[in-house]
């Protein structure tokens, strides 16, 4: 995807001056041996017992109660919703279809906004008219709403699921953002922590695993928290973390055998960061094969970008691109040693993919994955040609290439290839047709990357092209690009609401990959520089267990 893979250096001069910091983690995860990551029978039995207790609690709590809404919200935010997907879906479907208090006059803002958000988040077309009762005749929010912190927080979260044309939610987002910032100044309690976290990244843009890790620390400070839920969430987090550590041990061994640090020292060496990225999308235990393959693919795509972007000569890149286009391992002798080493690693991973997908009768999908990797290389080559010739493309030319060189399409197709879920050929072709949700996500990932990278020496972006073509200031260009991103998010939201054009599996993949970019590029390039923010995030999810 945009951030981890593509640096997108359409250079403004002859220089290709990029120096990346060394691998932060090196062989750290080799310490997680099979003995350390083994899960005891007693732990598995305790996990199962607690899970069934929560399932019973879900089934026994009435759908038409506020308690059910709060229970579902807590389960999802604690990162354990994947155990109860059917129960949660059925409850929210029932609430959407039959709940008699949905439009009750005595509904308070906290409950109304929570109900709306849970239903909309589940994909049901909840009407935003439910919030009109909180607005006066002039269209302004009533005065008593202004000081209801919990109500405002829930309304803020709900308004982030807005689609085009929902003016009341657009107004709510602006209103709630300002009021919440003002009301929580100087506050240090659990609620204020939740507000500050939400204002940084709302639920609609939060990755499940990382969001759960952060939410647990706030949830346990809440006096009304459910101890059963919290204990199970912590146990589940720790057990799944052991699975991730075991996989990282294997990936680290693969990385050491490649020895890219020696053979391709110019490239970003980020295998653990790539794994962290994939955990953001597919953290559940059943996706182990996909996580391993996708980590290798992202890592190789990142190195591929650096070969084109900062090291290869135009003559080398021309032959290199032809060999990848033909997927011709017999022609690798034409390449310099570092490119031969790279090509062998790339071709080997796709052989591994073919073997693994053959076991689950999904071999047909591998060709789609290869084609997107080839297309990614073609776009990198186009950008390299622009850089060598000092050509400055138009905004239209730039986006035609940059939306693909972001790597987002390649990663979407490769991920849907490697997961166990069945994805039909018709569904692959639908994705490749670039439907609205794909186009919107491509736009978000590319432009988020461009905003984060703006000002980097030698790097051109959508901001530069917009300024040049429209004769506007830097501030105006930033505002316009930010507006395009906001509009694209509404497209994403709309496509996730019934009637939907694709399965939940596909939509989740598309949305979660987009969320990864929001995380990594919300205020800096946290992949290119992974020594601070990203390192801390990785520690919280993949290294440090929770204390139970």
Swiss-Prot record:
PANTHER family hit by this protein: (-)-GERMACRENE D SYNTHASE (PTHR31225:SF221), OS04G0344100 PROTEIN-RELATED (PTHR31225)
Keywords linked to the UniProt accession: Lyase, Magnesium, Metal-binding
The organism's place on the tree of life at top rank: Eukaryota
Cofactor (UniProt): Mg(2+)
Residues reported in the UniProt entry to bind Mg(2+) 2: 305, 309
Lineage start: Eukaryota, Viridiplantae, Streptophyta, Embryophyta, Tracheophyta
Binding site for Mg(2+) 3: 449, 457
Cofactor note: Binds 3 Mg(2+) ions per subunit.
Residues reported in the UniProt entry to bind (2E,6E)-farnesyl diphosphate: 268, 305, 309, 446, 449
Name of the molecule in the record: Beta-caryophyllene synthase
């Amino acid at each position: 995807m945009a951030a981890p893979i593509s640096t997108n250096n359409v250079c403004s001069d002859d220089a290709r001056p990029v120096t990346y910091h060394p691998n932060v983690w090196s062989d750290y995860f080799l310490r997680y041996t099979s003995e350390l990551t083994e899960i005891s029978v007693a732990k598995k039995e305790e996990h199962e017992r607690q899970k069934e207790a929560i399932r019973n609690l879900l089934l026994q709590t009435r759908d038409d109660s506020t308690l059910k809404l709060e229970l579902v919200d807590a389960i999802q935010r604690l990162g354990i919703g994947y155990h109860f997907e059917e129960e949660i879906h059925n409850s929210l479907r029932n609430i959407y279809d039959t709940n008699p208090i949905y439009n009750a006059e005595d509904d308070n803002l906290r409950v109304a906004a929570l109900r709306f958000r849970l239903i909309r988040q589940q994909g049901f077309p909840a009407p935003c008219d439910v919030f009109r009762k909180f607005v006066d005749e002039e269209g302004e929010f009533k005065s008593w709403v202004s000081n209801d912190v919990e109500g405002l927080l829930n309304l803020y979260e709900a308004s982030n699921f807005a689609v085009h044309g929902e003016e009341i939610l657009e107004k709510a987002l602006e209103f709630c953002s300002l009021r919440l910032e003002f009301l929580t100044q100087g506050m240090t309690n659990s609620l204020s922590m939740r507000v500050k976290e939400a204002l940084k990244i709302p639920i609609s843009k939060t990755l499940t695993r990382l969001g759960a890790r952060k939410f647990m620390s706030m949830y346990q400070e809440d006096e009304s928290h459910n101890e059963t839920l919290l204990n199970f969430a912590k146990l589940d987090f720790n057990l799944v973390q052991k699975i991730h550590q075991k996989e990282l041990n294997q990936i680290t061994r693969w990385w050491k055998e490649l020895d890219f640090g020696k053979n391709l020292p110019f490239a970003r060496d980020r295998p653990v960061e790539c794994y962290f990225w994939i955990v953001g999308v597919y953290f559940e235990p059943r996706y182990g094969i996909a996580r391993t393959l996708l980590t290798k693919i992202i890592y190789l795509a990142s190195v591929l970008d650096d070969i084109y972007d900062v090291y290869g000569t135009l003559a080398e890149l021309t032959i290199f691109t032809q060999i990848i286009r033909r997927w011709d391992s017999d022609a690798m002798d034409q390449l310099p040693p570092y490119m031969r080493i790279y090509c062998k690693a790339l071709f080997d991973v796709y052989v591994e993919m073919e073997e693994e997908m053959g076991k689950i009768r999904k071999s047909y999908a591998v060709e789609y994955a290869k084609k997107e990797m080839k297309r990614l290389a073609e776009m990198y080559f186009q950008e390299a040609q622009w850089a060598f010739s000092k050509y400055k493309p138009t905004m239209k030319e730039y986006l035609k290439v940059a939306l693909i060189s972001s790597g987002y399409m390649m990663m979407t197709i490769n991920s849907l290839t490697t997961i166990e879920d069945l994805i039909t050929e018709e569904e692959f072709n639908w994705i490749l047709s670039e439907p609205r949700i794909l186009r919107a996500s491509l736009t978000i990932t590319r432009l988020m990357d461009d905003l984060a990278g703006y000002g980097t020496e030698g790097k051109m972006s959508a901001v530069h092209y917009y300024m040049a073509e429209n004769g506007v200031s830097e501030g105006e260009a930033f505002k316009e690009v930010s507006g395009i991103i906001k509009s694209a998010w509404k497209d994403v939201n709309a496509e996730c609401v019934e009637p939907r054009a694709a399965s939940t599996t596909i939509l989740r993949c598309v949305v979660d990959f987009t969320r990864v970019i929001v995380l990594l590029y919300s205020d800096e390039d946290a992949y290119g520089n992974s020594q601070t923010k990203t390192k801390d995030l990785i520690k919280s999810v993949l290294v440090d267990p929770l204390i139970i």
